A protein has these predicted regions:
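N-terminal secretory signal peptides that target proteins for export/translocation
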Residues: 1-7
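A "functional boundary" signal
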Residues: 9, 24-336
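Bacterial N-terminal signal peptides
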Residues: 14-22
C-alpha cells in the first residue's frame, strides 16, 4: 500500500503543477460574480483552520488507540470489534490505508466471534473501503461473496449492506461514464438501494435512499425534493451524512443549471469536509469546477482544485486522481481553444 501511496503523491505534485499552469493560461478579465467575496471568506476561514481540525482528529484517534492498547487484554471479542469499528470509522474518509487495515482487523475479529451479523458487518465495511480507494473489482468481489440470510440478520446490518453495495455500483457508474456499462451499474445500484428500504427506520435515510434512486433515474426535481427532506431531517452532527447530502444537492442543482445554488451547497459541503478533516470527498473539486467554468474565477478555482488534489493524494484515492488525469486534456483544450 505504501508504494502505491508514494506513486500517487508524485502524481499529485505533477498534476498540481500542470493544472496551475493551465488555469492561468489565457486568463480573461471577466468581472467577479456577485457573491465572490462571501464564498472566498467562508472558504478562507475554514482552510486557515484545516491543520487544526486534522490535529484534533488525530488526537481523538490516538485516544481511541490508547484505550484499545490499555484495555485489550480484558476486552471481549465483541468489545474489540466495536473499538476497531470506531477506528475504522475515524479513518474511513481520512486515510485509505489505515481504514483498510482496520477493516481487515474487523474481519479477523468477526471470524473469532463466529457470528453471521458480525461477519456481514465486517465484510461490508471492507467492500465499502475498497471502493473508496478506487479498487472497484476487489470491492465488488468482496461484497458479492457475502452470504445474506435475511431472517438471521439485524435490520441495520442488512440496510448497511444493501446501501454500501448500491453505492459501490453507483460510484463505478460515475467513474466509467459511458453509454454501455454505466446505465447497467446504475440499475444494479438502484436495485440494491431498493432492497434496503424495508430495513430502514430513520426518515432522513429513507429520503436519502429514495433521492439517490431518483437521481440515478435522472428525475432531478424529485431527487432534489427528497434530498432537501433528508437534509431537513438529518443529524447535523453526522458529518459524513451531511457531506453526502450537501454535495449531492450541489450536483443536482448543477445539472438543473442552477449555478448559484450549486455553488452555495458545494461551499457548505466543502466547509463541512474541512471541519471534519474529511479527505475523501468531491465537494472541493466540484466547487472549483463550478467557479472555473461557470464564474470564470481562475484564482479561487486554482486554489480549491489544488486542495482537492492534495486531499486525494493524502487519502490514496486512486480513482479520484485518475479522473483528474482525464480532465487535464479538457482544461488544455478549453484554455488554448484546441
Amino acid at each position: 500500500m505504501q508504494e502505491h501511496r508514494q506513486k500517487y503523491v508524485w502524481s499529485f505534485w505533477i498534476i498540481s503543477i500542470i493544472i496551475i499552469s493551465i488555469l492561468y493560461i489565457g486568463c480573461t478579465n471577466g468581472n467577479p460574480f456577485q457573491y465572490r467575496e462571501d464564498v472566498a471568506k467562508q472558504m478562507s476561514l475554514a482552510l486557515q483552520q484545516k491543520d487544526v481540525y486534522c490535529r484534533e482528529k488525530l488526537n481523538h484517534i490516538d485516544s481511541i488507540r490508547n484505550f484499545l492498547n490499555t484495555n485489550i487484554k480484558r476486552m471481549t471479542d465483541e468489545e474489540k470489534f466495536q473499538v476497531n469499528a470506531n477506528l475504522y470509522n475515524e479513518f474511513k474518509l481520512y486515510s485509505f490505508d489505515s481504514a483498510f487495515h482496520y477493516a481487515t482487523q474487523l474481519c479477523r475479529i468477526a471470524s473469532v466471534i463466529d457470528s453471521s451479523a458480525y461477519m456481514v458487518s465486517a465484510k461490508t465495511r471492507l467492500g465499502y473501503i475498497l471502493a473508496r480507494g478506487g479498487l472497484f473489482k476487489e470491492s465488488l468481489d468482496s461484497l458479492s461473496s457475502i452470504q445474506i440470510e435475511k431472517d438471521a440478520l439485524p435490520a441495520k446490518v442488512l440496510a448497511d449492506y444493501y446501501i454500501s453495495f448500491g453505492r459501490v455500483y453507483h460510484d463505478l457508474a460515475d467513474y466509467t461514464k459511458d453509454d454501455v456499462f454505466s446505465s447497467r451499474y446504475n440499475q444494479l445500484g438502484n436495485e440494491l438501494l431498493t432492497e434496503s428500504l424495508p430495513y430502514l427506520s430513520d426518515s432522513s435515510t429513507v429520503c436519502y435512499v429514495k433521492g439517490k434512486i431518483a437521481l440515478k433515474e435522472n428525475k432531478l426535481e424529485r431527487a432534489k425534493q427528497l434530498y432537501q427532506q433528508a437534509l431537513n431531517l438529518c443529524d447535523t452532527t453526522d458529518s459524513e451524512t451531511l457531506s453526502i447530502l450537501l454535495s449531492t444537492m450541489a450536483y443536482i442543482n448543477r445539472n438543473l443549471e442552477l449555478d448559484d445554488e450549486a455553488i452555495h451547497y458545494y461551499v457548505k459541503a466543502a466547509v463541512n469536509d474541512i471541519r471534519s478533516a474529511t479527505k475523501e470527498s468531491v465537494s472541493m473539486r466540484g466547487l472549483a469546477t463550478m467557479l472555473y467554468y461557470h464564474k470564470n474565477d481562475v484564482n479561487l478555482a486554482s486554489e480549491y482544485i489544488n486542495e482537492a488534489f492534495e486531499d486525494a493524494a493524502f487519502y490514496g484515492t486512486r480513482h479520484r486522481i485518475n479522473v483528474i488525469g482525464t480532465l487535464l486534456p479538457v482544461f488544455v483544450g478549453e484554455k488554448l481553444d484546441i
